[in-house]
């Protein structure tokens, strides 16, 4: 039905007759002619109708926004005075000879001239996706997946599918369960990741695997989370962590070059401990120059208990952030930052303005200055590299509260004061994560997942001092987003059983939930390692949006609902009976009946 896309016409098409299909983006009458902007997935081109072509001109009178049409016309170069440099097709226009109105459109429930609510956009998603910026994002997504497949294929990886209906295993979030009609009372689980299957493929000898795969997690949503999401899943045998990172870094660098024409350069490597101490985050945004600086050793003996208390506590922390030019901040704004860190458990935010670096005590302004000796003040200013016109913010509390609060403050200051270089790219690898973290109930939980191998420890050493264990894990971070994470996997049954035991999974439960894995580990399992990229987050970064719903064709809301199809919905009672499922109503629902 078409010979060209609207958005691809240029001066090379001048004089050619073309057939275009698409939608009326805008219509206007000017000087006896009818002009429309015609749109398809590739962009917009100007089309005009002349009374000399009476049949087409008469039909064009009926055109309204979003009518679906086909036109036949000749491409012409626009006069120099009419060239539109804001349009990709702005040097040309199409003189229409014939017009067919394929389908008319009622007035749209979305207004193209104003910002529509996200609720309206999701309810009428098929209309929202007609917008050029939305189409561009999905086209970029398609370009990314196509590039990834070519790269992986060229590096010897095999695209192998893994099951969608599988067994529930503890991976950190709730599973979506699917009842079995044949095996009444039993349930499949939709996979949170293909983790165990890809490890089993390594045990099967496939060596290099990848898959662009849907994953499912029933968890509370955030702006960058969805109940169903897409991973670029990768696993390798006989490769070290360093070799895996090398290949995956090459993929990221070539992807950025292909999509953005940006060379990311070599990725620096930073340990988890360094990232938390310097940036207050295990996914630091290195575009922001601000850092957390530890000063606990300098304030152990000051009379200010807010500082000296945590400074003398093995689990405490006192850290400062030096903000260049921050001495100009008003007291009102400083108080707002104090309220901000309260969100993260901090009891307050101490501050010190450096008005004149050379003037010592006389050159600073702060409610806490009276508690600091000249020597302590000088030591703090020297360590933080404070200069005249700067401000220091201090956090003092438990290590976790200070790290979380000051890390969040660092990001906010970077945005508010325009210190973060938003037009740049800052990738890195974060490595050497703790193997375990406290679960809040007196036990331990795996920081990544329970199949990650420890670095340089035997099962006996791991069982003896699990809190000292460092995981052989790595995350790829770009501009403060964790875009991919992976690890070397456990490939010996004894080590896997030890990890399960540390996590409180007894022998019976190990056999019940992971018997197939423990059995497979007995039969010559090769060393293996892998990584998974979050495709949705990659597309977010590469398209410049901060909302994951902008890069998914039909996303869910933060309440895990689809406003367009009204999913989830109630099941037919007959279907529930066939599945042997009984829906238990809440007491409040029973009372209302």
UniProtKB/Swiss-Prot annotation:
A Pfam family it matches: tRNA-synt_2
GO CC annotation: cytoplasm
UniProt-listed GO biological process terms: aspartyl-tRNA aminoacylation
Renumbered residue ranges of the record's region Aspartate: 195-198
InterPro entries per the UniProt record, alphabetical: Aa-tRNA-synt_II (IPR004364), aa-tRNA-synth_II (IPR006195), aa-tRNA-synth_II/BPL/LPL (IPR045864), Asp-tRNA-ligase_1 (IPR004524), Asp-tRNA-ligase_1_N (IPR047089), Asp/Asn-tRNA-synth_IIb (IPR002312), AspRS_core (IPR047090), GAD-like_sf (IPR004115)
Keyword check for Mitochondrion: no
CDD domains reported for this sequence: AspRS_core, EcAspRS_like_N
Entry's Gene Ontology molecular function annotations: aspartate-tRNA ligase activity; ATP binding; nucleic acid binding
Domain of life: Bacteria
UniProt-annotated binding residues for ATP: 217-219, 226, 482, 534-537
Cellular compartments annotated: Cytoplasm
Reaction(s) catalysed by this chain's protein: tRNA(Asp) + L-aspartate + ATP = L-aspartyl-tRNA(Asp) + AMP + diphosphate
Keywords: Aminoacyl-tRNA synthetase, ATP-binding, Cytoplasm, Ligase, Nucleotide-binding, Protein biosynthesis
EC category name: ligase
Record bears the keyword ATP-binding: yes
Function: Catalyzes the attachment of L-aspartate to tRNA(Asp) in a two-step reaction: L-aspartate is first activated by ATP to form Asp-AMP and then transferred to the acceptor end of tRNA(Asp).
Family: Belongs to the class-II aminoacyl-tRNA synthetase family. Type 1 subfamily.
HAMAP family to which the protein is assigned, alphabetical: Asp_tRNA_synth_type1
UniProt name for this protein: Aspartate--tRNA ligase
Annotated organism of origin: Serratia proteamaculans (strain 568)
Lineage of origin: Bacteria, Pseudomonadati, Pseudomonadota, Gammaproteobacteria, Enterobacterales
Primary gene name: aspS
């Amino acid at each position: 039905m078409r010979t060209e896309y609207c958005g691809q016409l240029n001066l090379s098409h001048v004089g050619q007759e073309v057939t275009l299909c698409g939608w009326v983006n805008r219509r206007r009458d000017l000087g006896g002619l009818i002009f429309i902007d015609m749109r398809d997935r590739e962009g917009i081109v100007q089309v005009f109708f002349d009374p000399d072509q009476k049949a087409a001109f008469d039909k064009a009178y009926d055109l309204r926004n979003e009518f679906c049409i086909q036109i036949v016309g000749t491409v012409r170069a626009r006069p120099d005075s009419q060239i539109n440099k804001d349009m990709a097709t702005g040097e040309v226009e199409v003189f229409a000879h014939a017009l067919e109105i394929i389908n008319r459109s009622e007035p749209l429930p979305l207004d193209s001239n104003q910002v529509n609510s996200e609720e309206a956009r999701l309810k009428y998603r098929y209309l929202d996706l007609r917008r050029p910026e939305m189409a561009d994002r999905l086209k970029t997504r398609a370009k990314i997946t196509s590039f990834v497949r070519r790269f992986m294929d060229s590096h010897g990886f095999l695209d192998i599918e893994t099951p969608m209906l599988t067994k529930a295993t503890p991976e950190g979030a709730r599973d979506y369960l699917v009842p079995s009609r044949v095996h009444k009372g039993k349930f499949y689980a939709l996979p949170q990741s293909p983790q165990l299957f890809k490890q089993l493929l390594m045990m099967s000898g496939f060596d290099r695997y990848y898959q662009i795969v849907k994953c499912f997690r029933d968890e509370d949503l955030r702006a960058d989370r969805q109940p169903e999401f897409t991973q670029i899943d990768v696993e390798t045998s006989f490769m070290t962590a360093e070799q895996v990172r090398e290949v995956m870094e090459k993929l990221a660098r070539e992807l950025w070059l292909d999509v953005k024409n940006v060379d990311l350069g070599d990725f620096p490597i930073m340990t988890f401990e360094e990232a938390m101490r310097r940036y207050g985050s295990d996914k630091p945004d290195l575009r922001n120059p601000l850092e957390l600086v530890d000063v606990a050793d300098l304030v152990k003996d000051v009379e200010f208990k807010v500082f000296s208390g945590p400074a003398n506590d093995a689990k405490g922390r006192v850290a400062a952030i030096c903000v260049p030019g921050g001495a100009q901040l008003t007291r009102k704004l400083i108080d707002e930052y104090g309220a901000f860190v309260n969100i993260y458990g901090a009891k307050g935010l101490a501050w010190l303005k450096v008005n004149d670096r050379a003037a010592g005590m006389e050159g600073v302004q702060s409610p806490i200055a009276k508690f600091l000796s000249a020597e302590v003040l000088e030591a703090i200013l020297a360590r933080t590299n404070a200069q005249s016109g700067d401000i220091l913010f201090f956090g003092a509390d438990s290590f976790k509260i200070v790290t979380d609060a000051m890390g969040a403050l660092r990001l906010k200051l970077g945005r508010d004061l325009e210190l973060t270089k938003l037009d740049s790219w800052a990738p890195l690898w974060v490595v050497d994560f703790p193997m375990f973290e406290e679960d809040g109930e007196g036990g331990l939980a795996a920081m990544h997942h329970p199949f990650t191998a420890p670095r340089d420890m035997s099962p006996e050493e791991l069982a003896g001092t699990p809190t000292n264990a460092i995981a052989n894990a790595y995350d790829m971070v770009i501009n403060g987003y964790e875009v991919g994470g992976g690890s070397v996997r456990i490939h010996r049954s004894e080590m896997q059983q030890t990890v399960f035991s540390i996590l409180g999974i007894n022998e019976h439960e190990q056999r019940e939930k992971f018997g197939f894995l423990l059995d497979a580990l007995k039969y010559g399992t090769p060393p293996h390692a892998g990584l998974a990229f979050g495709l949705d987050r990659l597309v977010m970064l590469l398209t410049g949006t901060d909302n994951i719903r902008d890069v998914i064709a039909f996303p869910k809301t933060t309440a895990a609902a689809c406003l367009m199809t009204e999913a989830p919905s109630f099941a037919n009672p007959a279907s529930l009976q066939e599945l042997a499922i009984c829906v238990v109503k809440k007491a409040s629902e029973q009372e209302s009946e």
